[in-house]
């Protein structure tokens, strides 16, 4: 299980500081939607470069114009990009093709997708599907139960991530559930000592 640390709602300078504090422990650094909207993808290249070889995900939440947005994101240096599960099949297919062309990775955000929708879009075998409880909704009460229920319902989906209010005490149990990525944000990025918080979370995953 990989640890993805999400950076959101901070100035560019603070984003750079956070990146430098987590590169030794995070497996994936997420440049959150708020930053991609405020600064645009091209302007975020210095932040990507500060990651020093750690994979960087751009949480661009593509809904349309899949090829254009994904091509741009990969050219800017992102390794992973996100598309909404609610996007059209045409958009999802365009994003998948772009990911293949650029040797990139696609994450499908399942925010507000019901079971019928998930079933319909479950055929992207190289994609990572992200169980996502929104910031506005609040945190997931039991992420382990959520993962187990999802895997029982959709055994055909082989690559899974989870996001939304994940805390350090969830990690040991989640690491036993054979998921690809756990995504954490403020539990790490708002800590007094970000590097120490990230290190402590990694230890819980072993």
Predicted regions located by residue number:
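C-terminal helical cap(s) of enzyme catalytic domains, especially alpha/beta-barrels
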Residues: 95, 99, 175-176, 184-206
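Structural motif
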Residues: 24, 76, 124, 176-178
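Conserved anion-binding
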Residues: 3, 65-157
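A C-terminal functional module that forms or caps the active site or interfaces directly
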Residues: 54, 144-177, 181-188
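Conserved N-terminal beta1-alpha1 strand-loop-helix module at the mouth
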Residues: 1-67, 75, 119, 189-190, ...
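Short secondary-structure boundary segments
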Residues: 33, 85, 110-111, 133-134, ...
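Glycine-rich beta-to-alpha transition loops that act as phosphate-gripper elements at the mouths
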Residues: 8-9, 58-67, 109-114, 159-169
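Hydrophobic residues within beta-strands of alpha/beta enzymes
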Residues: 29, 81, 129, 182-183
């Amino acid at each position: 299980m990989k640890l993805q640390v999400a950076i959101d709602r901070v100035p560019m300078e603070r984003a750079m500081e956070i990146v430098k504090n987590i590169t030794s422990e995070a497996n994936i650094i997420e440049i959150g939607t708020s930053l991609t909207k405020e600064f645009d993808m091209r302007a975020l290249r210095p932040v990507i470069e500060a990651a020093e070889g750690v994979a960087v995900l751009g949480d661009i939440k593509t809904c349309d114009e899949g090829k254009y947005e994904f091509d741009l994101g990969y050219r800017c240096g992102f390794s992973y990009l996100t598309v909404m599960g609610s996007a059209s099949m045409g958009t999802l297919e365009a994003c998948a093709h772009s990911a293949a062309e650029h040797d990139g990775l696609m994450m499908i955000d399942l925010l507000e997708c019901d079971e019928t929708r998930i079933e319909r879009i479950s055929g992207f075998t190289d994609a990572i599907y992200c169980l996502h409880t929104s910031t506005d909704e609040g945190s997931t009460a039991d992420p382990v139960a959520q993962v187990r229920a999802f895997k029982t319902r959709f055994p055909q989906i082989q690559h899974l991530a989870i996001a939304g209010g994940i805390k350090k005490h969830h990690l040991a149990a989640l690491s036993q559930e054979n998921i690809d990525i756990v995504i954490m944000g403020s539990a790490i990025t708002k800590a007094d000592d970000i590097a120490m918080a990230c290190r402590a979370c990694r230890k819980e995953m072993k």
